[in-house]
Each structure stands twice: as C-alpha cells, then as structure tokens.
Amino acid sequence: MADHQARQSGSSQRTVIPDPQLAKEKSNLTNYLRVFAYATRWDFCVYVVGALASIGVGVTMPLMNVVLGQLVGDFSDTVQDPYNMDLNNFKSMLQKQSLYIVGLFLGRWLLNSINKFCFRMIGIRLSSAIRHHYLRSLFAQSIHVIDSMPPGAAATAITATSNTLQIGVSERLGTFVTYVSTIIAAIAVAFTRSWSLTIVSASLLVYIAIIIAIVVPIYLKANAATLKADAQGTAVASEALQGIRLVNACGAHERIISKYSKWVTKAMERSQRVAPIIGAQTGLVFFGIFGVFGLAFWYGTQQFIHGVIKNVGVVIIVLTSVMLILFAFSYLEQPIMAISQAMVAATELFKVIDAPLPPMGSFTPDINSKDLIFKDVTFEYPSRPGARVLDGLSFRIQAGQNTALVGPSGSGKSTIVGLLERWYSLKHSPVLPEAATPRSSKEGERDNHDERKYERSTYEVPIMVPTNLTGALSGSISIGAHDLDDLEGKWWRAQIGLVQQEPFLFNSSIFENVANGLLGTVWENESEAKKRKMVQDACQEAYAHEFICRLPDAYDTRVGDGGAKLSGGQKQRIAIARSIVKRPQIMILDEATSAIDAKSEKIVQAALDRAIKTRTTITIAHRLSTIQKADHIVVLSKGRVVEEGTHKSLMEHENGVYYSLVEAQSLRLSTTDDTDSDLPATTYVAELKSAAVDIEQPLEVQNDEDNGPVVEPEVLRTLTQSFVKLLEGLRDQSSSFLLITIASMGVGAATPLQAWLFAKAVIVFISPSDDLKKEGDFWGFMWLALAGGVGVAYFFQCWISLRLQYHVGATTKQSYLRDMLYQELSFFDDDSRSSGTLIGRIAGDPKQVEGVFGLNLASATSSVFTIVGCLIISLTFGWKLGLVGLCVTVPIMMVSGFWKFRHELQFDQMNAAVFAESSQFASEAIGAMRTVSSLTMESAINNRYKQLLDGHVEAARRKAQWTAVIFGFAESATLGCQALILWYGGRLISSGEYSLEAFMVSYMAIINGVEYAGQILGVAPSAAQAAAAANRILDVQDSNRSSQEAEKSGPTVEDTDGGVEIELCNVSFKYPTRNVSIYKNLDLTIKKGQYAALVGPSGCGKTTIISLLERFYDLEPNHGEILWNGTNINDFGVYQYREHLSLVSQEPILFRGTIRDNILFGVADPSSVPEERIHEVCRDVFIHDVIVSLPDGYNTEVGAMSLSGGQKQRIAIARALIRNPKLLLLDEATSALDSESEKIVQAAFEKARKRRTMIAVAHRLATIQDADIIFVFDQGMVVEKGTHGELLQKRGIYWDMCQTQALDQ
C-alpha cells in the first residue's frame, strides 16, 4: 500500500516522477525482491517454513556423502586386510549405516513435501496478488492512458508474464534454495574433512560465478527485447481476433498473419542470437564441474602421498561432495533461468503498478439546481500538441434542462463528454507509458481518442511531462462554484448517467448489468430484493421489461460476450436502464438512440424524455429528430459554438448551420396527410406499450440448461498423441533433432564414464605407494579429457535445442493464429472462446509447447541415454547389483515419477482453467474501460477479480496437498534406493563375490541411473502445462482442417459488370449457438444493379442477411439457398467468393498501422494499387482533404492520430470501395456520421451504386429513401416492399416509421 500512496504527487500544473533514465536503471533484482512485499505475515511464515524445509532437503545429500565415505573406508579396510575382518561387525555396521540412510530418506520425503507445498502455495498467492495489483493500478490510470496502450498487452501481462513470475517465485525458487543449501552443506562437510582439498574444489564456484556474471546480463537484455517483440505480435493478434468479422469480410487473413509473423520472427531471431552464448555458458560450466573433480582427485592423491590425508574415506567424502556440487550446479541452471525471467516479468509488471496516479479531487458538494459552465475551454490531446479540439469554448448547461450538442464530426462533442466524465483534465495531462495494458476495441469513442503512436517498446518506463509540453490546456468547467477537477472523481461520476453510442454489456445476467448502475450510489449495498425492484422499474422506464420477461430466464438471462446475444436496440435499452437506475442528477446521452431502428427509437425516446424531465441533460445526436424537443441546442464547429437556441429559433435562420443539418436529414413525406401524423396522447402511450412487446423478436440466446451452444466436443488425446502430432509439423527440423540426439548421446555417456572413473579413483588410493603418483596423474588427465568432451556435448546440445525451441515457439504461434483466423464464425460465438480468452491462449499456449521441445526434450533424451549407459556398465561390472537396479530401483523411480507427472498434469489443467477465467474477465473489463469508469465499477471489478483469484488459490491449496506428498516421495526415493544398493552391495563384498572396483562402478552407475530415471519425468511441470496447451492448439487445428475440407473448389465467381442478382429462396436459418429460428421459408430477390434497403425493428433479422451473404454462416442442407447470378453461393470457394463483395459495418474498426494500410486492408496485393486510385476513392468519400492535412498524410499512424468517428467511418468506406466489389453491403454504415458528413458520404454511395448491387441495412430512413427497393422486415419476414413513395402510399409499417423520424412537422 505504501508505494501506491507515494505515487500520488505534484500540483495541478505539473506531475513529477523520478527521472526516466534512473527508472530504467532500477535493478531487475530489486523488482524481483519487491514481489515478496505483497506477502502477508502468514505468507512469510509459510515462506520461512518452506525455506527451512528446502534447506533441510539440501542438507540430506551431503550427510549421505558422510555415510558413503565411512562405508567406502570400511570396504577399503576389508579389501586390504580380508583375513582380519570380523564378518558380524561388518554386517552390523552395514545394517546401521543402511538404516541411517533410510532415516535420511524419510526425513527428505517429509521435508520435500513441505517444501513443495509451501513454495507452490506462496507462488500462487503472490502471483494472484500481483495480478490483482496490476489490474487495480491500471484502472486507477486516466482513460487516455489506457487508450494509448496497444491491444493484447493486458492479456500478455495477466497471463504469460504473470505465469512467468509465478514460476520464478514458487517451486523454482524452492529448488534454487535447495541446491544452494546442498552446495553450502557439501562444502562444509568437505571443509571439515580437508580444508585444503576443499579450497581447491571451491575454485569451481569462482569460475562459474565469472561465467554467469558475463552471460546473465546478455541473456536478460535479449529476453527483454524478445518480450517487447512478443507484445507487439500479441497486439496484432488481439486486434485481429477482436475484429474477426472484418478480417473475414476483407479476406485479410494472410495480411494479418504476415504482420504477426514479422514480430514473431523478430522475437525468435533475437532469442536465437543469444542461444550460442547460453550454449557456451552451459558447456563451460560443465567443463568446469567435471574438470574440477579431476583437479580435486589429482590434488587428493598428492595429499595422500604426503600423509596429509590418511583415510581414503576422507578423499571419498570430499570427492563425492564435489560430485554433489557438480549435480547441484547442473540442476541450478533451470531455476536460475526461471528466476531471471521472473525478474524481467516483475520489472514489466511494476512499470504499470508504479505508474503515477492522476490527482483526484476531494469535494462532494450539493450540486442540485446548479448549472454546468464551460468558460474559455481550450483543449488539445497529449498526443497531438498543436491540434486544438476545443478552442475557447464557452457555453452554459442549465440545471434541469435538456441541452443538445450538435455539429459535424470532429467538432468536439465527445471530447466534451470526456471532460465532463473527468476522463481528461484541463489542469493536468500526463503522458504515460505504452508499457501497460491496452484497451480492447470493443468499446470505442467516436471523437478524438488519445491513441498514441506505438513507436517505442511495449514495456517502457513511465514518462510524465509538464502540461505546457503536451498541448494547450486552459479555461475551466464548473458546477456551482466548484471546478470539476476539485470534485471527488468517483462521487462525481456517480451523479452522471451516461448512455453511449456503442453500449457495452458485461458477460453476465441482465439483472447484474443493470444493477451495475447502482455502484457508487447510496443503493449499492441494498438487499437483492430491493435492487431487483429498482432494476425492474428502470427497465420498465426504458421499455425493456416486456422483452426481458419473454426470455427463458428473464432477468437472469446471460447476454454473452460484450452483449453479443442481444440486438443493437436491445443492448441500448439495457444500457439506458443501467444509466437511470441510480437516479442520476445529470444525464449524458451520447448518440443514445443511434443504434435503434425507427420504431424502437420512438419507444426509447419516449422513455428518455420521461427519464430526463427533472434532470440536467446533455444530449449528443447526429439524428436530429431526437433533439427537436431539447430546451437548448448548441451548434459546434471546430471546437467553438457557432449557434445556440431552440429547434424553432434555429430553423428560422435558413442560412444557418443547424438549418442545413436538418435539411440534410429531411424525409420526403409528400404523400402523407399532415393531419394524421400526430396521434392523440392516449393512443400514443398505448402504441408505445404495444410496440415494446410486439416489435421485439425473442432474444436469440440459449437457456444454459436446455439450449446450450452447439459446439464440437474437444478431442481427448494422450500426451504422446499430442506431441507426435505436433512433431509431424516439424519434419523440416529433422536435422536439428538428429544433432540434438547426437549431442545428447555425448551428454548421456558422461555419467557412466564418470562412474567408472570414480571407481578407478577409489582404487588408486589402495594401490602400492610406488604406483600412486603415476596412477593419480593418469586418471586426473582422464577426468580432464572427460570434462572437455562433456563441455563440447553440452554446448551443442544447449545451442541447438534452444534454436529448435525458439523455432517451435515461433512456428506454433503463427500456425495457431492462422488456424484461429480461418475458423468459421460460429467458432467465435461460443462463450468459452471470447476474444479475451483466445488472446490469452495465443500469448500463453505456444510458450508452453516450445518449452517441451527445447531444453526439456534434450534433457529427457540425454537422461534416456544416461540410464541405458548406466545399466549397461552396472551389469557389465556387477550383474547382480545391476539387476537390482534394473528390476527394483529404476521401476520405483519411474513409477513415482509417473504419479508425480499425473498429479502435476491435473493440477496445471485446473490452474489453466481458473486463470483463463480470470484472464477473460480482466480482458473484458479493460476493453470496457469507459463503461467501467462511468459506472464507477473499478472497485467492483477489482473485487470480483480478486474473488476469482482467491477461489483459484483455495482450489490450488486443496490440490497441492496431495501433489506435494507425491512430489516429495518422487524426489526423495533415490535415497531409499541408495540404502538398498549399499546394503546389498556390502553383503556382496563381505561374501567376496565383488571387488571394491566392481562394487563402486555398479553402485555409482545405478545411483546416477536412478537419479536420471526420476529426471525423465522431472519435466512434469513443463510437460503438464504443455500437454493441455498442445491439446488446445490441436483442437483449433483440427477444427480448421474440418473447415478447409468443407471448402469446395467449385465454380469461379464470374467478373460481371453492373453488379449481381441476389436471390434468397425458401431460406430457413438459426444461429449455430442459438436455438431460435431467425427465418422460416424466407424469399427475397434483389435484381442486378439495384440499390436495396432492409429496414425494420431491432431483432427482426436484417443484419442476419448481411451475415449470410458474407458467408459468415452457411445454410444447412434442405434449408433453402442463396443464389448469386443463379449459382448457389455455397458452391463457391468462400475466400474467392468474398473477394467480390465488401462490407461496411456500423462500428468502424481500424487496425494498427498507417491510414494507407487500413485503406488497403482488404486488397490482396496492396502494391498493385496506384496512389492515384487511393486518392480517388478517398475523394469520393470526402476524406482525402482530412488525410493530406495530417503531418504524415496517408502515412500517418492510426494510433498516433485521434480520428473522429465520422472520419474513421469514411476510411472504412474507402476500404470497402477500393476493392471494387460487385456487391456492397452497408450495415448501418452512416449511423456514426453527423448530418453533414452523412450527406457527403451518401452522395459517394449514390456514385458508387451505379456499377454494382448495393444492399443497405438502415435505421435512419433518410439515408435509404432513394433506394430502388425497400424491404420492411418484422419477425424474420418481409411484410412490405417497394420504393419509398410506394410504401408511403400504403400507410403501413414503413409509413409509421417515417412519421417518427420526420423533422419538418
């Protein structure tokens, strides 16, 4: 908590933080140690217990060396003087020492179990705490800071980065403590026996420390660079998955994959560049380890010759201690690497956690009946100094009145909303890092988002600069006598009810979504019954109650990811209910009815009119029919007020801006009778109530029990099946596998040879004194030769396996994203495959798989060769002892390792499932940051996230108890095996069957073989995680193959002039994940070159036709057909078919890159499009002048420029037209545009329609009144069709919709 409090500093004009260069130099180790500051007192107690247990585990093996040394000494005495041996005393001593080893085994089992349980639990607890603090710190930042973050970084931080940190503070840290204590204890034991020999042996420590000091900084730097490139790639994948419909419509799969591959390849190359350095480190370390054993052996013989060491047991204790240090150092490699990666991960996470917080006010005054006053407000976004959004803006919003803000796109309307919501400030405008979590594109703002160019690395030190360097900020916004910046932020937002153009709903029940509006109010802690009553009242006010009650679960119906299971109008009414349930004093309606059809608009507008009667209201609208009754209308242009007044007074100025805006939206109603247009009040209210029920198609959601999503079950595969299938895709790496195998054979041969050399070393000490020096020199040289060979083998093994590992990771990432992008759209409709979940999988799953195919694979391979070599040499020198090892000890280690692996697999599957849930929740919340902020949901989101994490910790605690016991046994069983081998081998020596050399060779070979047998399955943690990840990857791959197999290579779409004829013949359809029929036997014909419009209430099936024409979904057999110039569209190859049509959706989506990149997004070969063609299309949609006015013109990065919603939409339209489609689909394509822009773009459409067929879905009827034919839908059927004039003459549903939107009555 202390560092959170320390971060808030500075004045209203300047926020000061430490110099960024100093921040960059902060030690990774310091940040790693800071992680432990999140531990509670109880956590520290558990840590102490776990650390003591780890130390105890580490000490057991050096104590075992003491026993072994004493036994060898006794065996040596027996061999030298067999006639004076007391057999009973020898057997008694043998039994005593064997029981002592059994005691060590039991103690090590207990301590290992405690160690594993404690470190695993604390690791999960600390990881959960860091994840929680990361999210909390992110939500405490200003909105524009989160706007500037690239998509996907949140998922990376909360999944892959946090997982890396968790590994480095849990079991791997415990392993590090264990082996460090082993090294220290081994040195202590050796030192007490012979300090001089120990000092010689300890030279190894200095040697390894020098190597590590050289290599680790290089590795850390390379790893940080890799993380940055990975984050860039994740951002590309994130955008693609969030905009998957647009990617499919544009056929931009390969473009996205190419862009993603560029970053993935860069990350791979950076990693592979450091692979030989890590290989050299490993080779040099193992050369030193084996070499120092030869040095210690040679020096020991010298000491023995001169009488300094008199007992061969002393030499054995020291030598085995050196060997133990050898093993301990070799085992330290992975823990050190894990801790190093955790240091980097901690630094990345703390960059966000430590980011300075914006100043917050503290006043909570009475604002009832107080006016809102804008006085000389000048505002520029931090990323756009010099580009004024508001320029000396002054106006007053009267208390209790409805003030409407109108004007063209980019005039500053939504910036005013941002200032009122305190998302931006006139006193401080910090520029914060691109190091944190991005916002999702699910929830956009239409005007002037502060999206900064992503030039620097994704993870960078926070930077704040003085406001005078970030753009002009002046003026004031006040309510009563109080400046908005002086008010307490959350309290102020709780006084505002905000309804945005693009409503965002959370993937929870309707009740929970509406009840979110009560957060931060006096009703937040009311009983559920009271809340339900308030929610129901609010829904009735918003005319949503009736359609909700018709759902299977009513208010408990879940709305899907982002509210995907609701129509646009349904979502908007839920959002309106959410905003009015808290009875706010101020209402802000930011295009609140833009997504609603004409009839629904009349209903909702009536609800809004009723809701705002006694409230101060700010209404932003492009559809001017919604603000005719406003008490005051403010007309904006270029950040200034150009006109003010009522609708009536402004319409008196025929040359005025407002008058021209109204004229642009007017509907021709010449065939209507004016006397009939106004209904009596009682009739109007009755009509509203009737329409609220009748126009709504039942919500297309499924009852979770009865009508669950129809998704294909995941294929269950064994670990072997998963990895064999993945290996099939790595045939091009067969040479790497071969080289790894050869190098692993060299590594595997080291241990059997070491056992033989060790036995020879023991025999040397019982040789005649004349031969001792000569033998000592010879065998010391043999140790040196072995060290050289082992160093070379380890160098190549590590280098090649790391290169393979990084290659596997890169190729898996690319194929994984490719398989995801090429899925059918129904794949993404399943709740378990939300964009947040898939982004987390893209970031995490390939990482898990690459770990198994790299060093872990090489380690397992060399372990197999080691076991085989050890068994061969033990059977050669002593077959009886070898058989005991083969038939008893090795099976024990293998079985215990198998059970360890099995429980670890189950644990990691549970771990992945829970963290996937929490990751999905966090990603969804970050994507809806504006909604979260406006509803003051930050605390609720944090608490819910913490509940998810706490639940995971508790589930992990229960599971970890059993896995810890099994782990403890598996990692201690080697001591039990040693007790058995020593006891049996001693009996063989005492009976004279074995010589000391035969026993020592067999004993050392069996013990080392047993150790490596356990290590084969010692990769359980990595393999367990990788197995689950591999299954998910293969499930996606198999699903994509099914899609590809379904792809037909039928007829080619003919390149015809003048458009195409579209026929829907007897079409029946329901969505794959929903059990509700959309159409039953629908027939519809659109002639070649026609401009057809589809209109009707929300949920009637208009947009579904667009989805079917785009082949987002295909009709099932015998459910009708859709014909393209007489050919069933299902007969065409889907990707080739989509090249001939373009889609412009209601919500414009622009991807990272330049404006030119976005315009050419749907073009297969962008280089083939001349620059003049790009300019021509942009001129047609009247965006060219805006683009060339930007500093970099068409090369302007989209993220570096805050484009208004209208500007974004015009770029999206240019993107559609440059493909020269035969069929142009417009799904509310002009709904985000102001009247002036709409008129311009409509003219562009009129020009574009001459050469193609055009189908438009529209709620704003003025945009389609010139259509050649208009189809009026209701409940999945065409109930009227004709031209605008013909339908008005019928005075039916269409006529009624026109009356609602008419502006000239």
Curated annotation (Swiss-Prot):
ATP binds at residues 407-414, 1096-1103. Keywords: ATP-binding, Glycoprotein, Membrane, Nucleotide-binding, Repeat, Transmembrane, Transmembrane helix, Transport. Belongs to the ABC transporter superfamily. ABCB family. Multidrug resistance exporter (TC 3.A.1.201) subfamily. Residues 48-348, 738-1025 form the ABC transmembrane type-1 domain. PANTHER family: ATP-DEPENDENT PERMEASE MDL1, MITOCHONDRIAL, ATP-DEPENDENT TRANSLOCASE ABCB1-LIKE. Signal peptide: none annotated. ABC transporter; part of the gene cluster that mediates the biosynthesis of the lipopeptides W493 A and B. W493 A and B consist of six amino acid residues D-allo-thr, L-Ala, D-Ala, L-Gln, D-Tyr, and L-Val/L-Ile linked to a 3-hydroxy-4-methyltetradecanoic acid polyketide chain. May be involved in excretion or internal transport of W493 A and B. InterPro entries: AAA+_ATPase, ABC1_TM_dom, ABC1_TM_sf, ABC_transporter-like_ATP-bd, ABC_transporter-like_CS, P-loop_NTPase, Type_1_exporter. Residues 434-454, 1038-1057 are annotated as: Disordered. GO terms for molecular function: ABC-type oligopeptide transporter activity; ATP binding; ATP hydrolysis activity. It is a multi-pass membrane protein. It comes from Fusarium pseudograminearum (strain CS3096). This is ABC transporter FPSE_09185. Gene3D superfamilies: ABC transporter type 1, transmembrane domain, P-loop containing nucleotide triphosphate hydrolases. Disulfide bonds: none annotated. Residues 440-454 have a biased composition (Basic and acidic residues). One of its GO terms (cellular component) is mitochondrial inner membrane. GO terms for biological process: oligopeptide export from mitochondrion. Glycans are attached at residues 28, 468, 507, 525, 1040, 1066, 1075, 1125. Residues 372-663, 1062-1300 form the ABC transporter domain. The chain crosses the membrane at residues 44-64, 99-119, 172-192, 199-219, 277-297, 312-332, 737-757, 780-800, 851-873, 877-899, 964-984, 999-1019. The keyword Heme does not apply. It is found in: Membrane.
